[in-house]
């Protein structure tokens, strides 16, 4: 399944690899990869595959979940997953609104509910963990995070470990670059460059 999802992301252009002409992230980091999982929304077959896989992941790893929560980017996927699991859903804003009721959590998240957070992409883990903290402040028990893709950065691993929180993804960086070589999207020579970025993203390309 990891390779299937990776192949779909590459085929629809949700993930772009440019080892020789790197992207610049908003953080200023130079990267040979750019991921825009919002493109999955335009492909019904791909989004069904993702929703089915996320639902199965939750059944396997978080069978006691009774609430699905989406980050802003994870809202559509959270909706499709909650429908498959027949569970209620909410979503978590990056920060509380400054008008109306000033809510950060939209929908209903009651104290004691066991929640899985749905994210489209794990980079440093900051967005996911901000949602986790908001849900904990609301009295929920957060079981973990489920996402489509992760870069597998050490910073994210450390962040989730610090919160003692499991995070599972449908596919990952290593699987994706291996799949890209198999599909002819990048060369074996490019693979070495892509692996170097993964080992030291802060220094790569500097």
UniProtKB/Swiss-Prot annotation:
PROSITE patterns, alphabetized: PUR_PYR_PR_TRANSFER
Question: Which reactions are catalysed by this chain?
Answer: orotidine 5'-phosphate + diphosphate = orotate + 5-phospho-alpha-D-ribose 1-diphosphate
Task: Name a GO molecular-function annotation.
Answer: orotate phosphoribosyltransferase activity
The protein's name: Orotate phosphoribosyltransferase
What is the organism of origin for this protein?
Bacillus caldolyticus
Task: Please name the HAMAP family in this protein's record.
Answer: PyrE
Its annotated pathway? Pyrimidine metabolism; UMP biosynthesis via de novo pathway; UMP from orotate: step 1/2
EC number(s) for this protein?
2.4.2.10
Which GO biological-process labels does this protein carry?
'de novo' UMP biosynthetic process; pyrimidine nucleobase biosynthetic process
- Binding-site list for orotate: 123
Q: What induces it?
A: Repressed by uracil.
What cofactor is needed?
Answer: Mg(2+)
Renumbered to this chain, the signal peptide range is none
Q: How does it assemble?
A: Homodimer.
What's in the keyword line of the UniProt record? Answer: Glycosyltransferase, Magnesium, Pyrimidine biosynthesis, Transferase
Q: Which residues bind 5-phospho-alpha-D-ribose 1-diphosphate?
A: 93, 97, 99, 119-127
Family to which this protein belongs: Belongs to the purine/pyrimidine phosphoribosyltransferase family. PyrE subfamily.
**The protein's role, per its UniProt record:** Catalyzes the transfer of a ribosyl phosphate group from 5-phosphoribose 1-diphosphate to orotate, leading to the formation of orotidine monophosphate (OMP).
Q: Record keywords: Glycosyltransferase included? A: yes
């Amino acid at each position: 399944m990891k390779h299937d999802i990776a192949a779909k992301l590459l085929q629809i252009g949700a993930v772009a690899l440019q080892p020789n002409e790197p992207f610049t992230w908003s953080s200023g980091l130079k990267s040979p990869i750019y991921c825009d999982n919002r493109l999955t929304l335009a492909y019904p077959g791909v989004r069904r595959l993702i929703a089915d896989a996320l639902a199965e992941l939750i059944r396997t790893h978080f069978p006691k979940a009774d609430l699905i929560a989406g980050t802003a980017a994870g809202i559509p996927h959270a909706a499709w997953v909650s429908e498959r699991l027949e569970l209620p859903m909410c979503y978590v804003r990056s920060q509380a609104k400054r008008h109306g009721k000033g809510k950060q959590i939209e929908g209903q998240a009651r104290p004691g509910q066991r929640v899985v957070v749905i994210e489209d992409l794990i980079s440093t883990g900051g967005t996911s963990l901000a949602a986790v903290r908001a849900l904990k402040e609301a009295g929920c028990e957060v079981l973990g995070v489920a996402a489509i893709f992760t870069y597998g950065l050490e910073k994210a691993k450390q962040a989730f470990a610090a919160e003692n929180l499991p995070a599972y993804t449908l596919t990952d960086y290593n699987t994706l670059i291996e799949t890209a070589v198999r599909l002819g999207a990048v060369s074996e020579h490019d693979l070495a460059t892509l692996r170097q970025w993964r080992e030291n993203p802060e220094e790569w390309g500097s």
